[in-house]
Amino acid sequence: MRPLRPRPGTGPLGGPFVHLGVTSSTNDHARELALAGAPHGTVVVSEQQTAGRGRQGRSWSAPPGRALTLSVIVRLPGPALEQLPLAMAVAVCEACEAVAAVNCRIKWPNDVWIDARKVAGVLIEARPLDGWAVIGIGLNVDTAPGEFPPELRDTAASLRSATDRATDREAALDALLARLAAWLPRLESGRAVATAFRERDALDGERIAWTAAGARQTGEARGIDDDGALVVFTDAGERVRLDAGEVHLERTPAG
């Protein structure tokens, strides 16, 4: 569990690199920095989070020194910010594939899977009117299967559990930041983001369930459109578009 090395100066995204031992949440820390005027590309990484969180208010926990928990401040125009959730999931996939030679898929909108188990998640907290967002990423790097909480052992993965070998966290961090830096200039091309996402779409063709207006509905996922919405054909034959902010998705068995 060797700690990440401090990185004085600027990182590959052009902003300062903030390395913390322990924090409640890297997203909270980064948000405070953003409100205080921290520049684009500021990276906050912590060895341990005590109150990390994911989408829909879910918690994110990982043993100290086993995962990467980081947040990045980006200052971009509104249209680019809209593409962040899908693009950052693609970036995380590419980084995992580069350092661990794994086959990653994305459960819309931005959970990263290996063999249908979650290895990473992305949480975007955006302020479009102010022109900035915080990109939070949690990646299970070196967590052993037995180190996951019992309730997650059937659904969680790490690069170590997927490959049966250790992955260097420094290399994983370098790959993550490099892929984020590569995608940020391309965000205003919704088609480029959608195309890259479709190549790794874990739900395309799957039966899914979701909740809308308090009612559970089911249907078949048919990929995403160029705006990043999930296209679904309901069991009643209706074509609907689902936006990430208004639904909760879960896979269901066919039949």
Where are each of the predicted segments found?
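Long, positively charged amphipathic alpha-helical accessory segments at protein N-termini or as interdomain linkers
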Residues: 1-3, 78-82, 86-104, 114-255
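Short loop/edge segments at beta-strand edges and connector loops
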Residues: 21, 106-108
